Amino acid sequence: SSKSEKENIMQNTCLILLSYMECVTPDMAQDLAETADYIIAADGGQNRAREFGLQPDCVIGDFDSTTLDEDFDCIYITYPAEKDLTDTEAALTHALEKSCRNVILLGGMGGRLDHTMGNIGLLDKYYSSFDHMEFIDGKNRMELLKDSGRSLKRDARYKYFGLVSLNAEASGIDIRGAKYELTGASLERASTLGVSNEFKEDTVEICVQDGILLIVRSADR
């Protein structure tokens, strides 16, 4: 195969290191890095890279919250501090330019609530840009599901999973393989019906016919 084909295959999965991470251990970060073909450190994420002994392929940001040391052997991309997009979105834009298909964002939950809510918005904005996109840390994982189905494989780190509608109402919701199963159900945005579910089987099947669901997996702590 050609060099360009190899590069495309190589950059299939992207790991984005964010500055704020909850309960992320070096082992967890290194395991995710091993499955990634391209690693982006978003601004303060370069400090996490140093902390975990990871080598990013690119460091991107406005460097308002961290100094630009340029001590990694990689590409550095600087944005003006008064830019219209966050460092997280700048990293996602770069992942798109690199033709990455799967994106794991390490961190970005907890901490400042406005940032967490903004990151849920990014899951929505970039939903069709990538084959898969998910925020992960030591406490939670979050991803979106729109008008389609998904299989969740049991992950021992996260005992619970919950569904939250991002529409006024999501309908045609099926859940199989879980402690609490649903068939053709509707979920309103204000409803707590979808929270605190658990795996019964090794795989849970979730389907929504009409609407957007935020899928959150949470650790038991």
Q: Which residue ranges define each predicted feature?
A:
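Short, acidic/small-residue loops that bind anionic groups at enzyme active sites
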Residues: 127-141
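Short, Lys/Arg-enriched N-terminal segments with co-localized hydrophobic residues
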Residues: 1-9
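Short phosphate-binding loop-to-helix
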Residues: 76-98
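Short Gly/Thr/Asp-enriched flexible loops that form oxyanion-binding sites at enzyme active sites
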Residues: 114-124
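Long, charged alpha-helical interface segments
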Residues: 140, 145-221
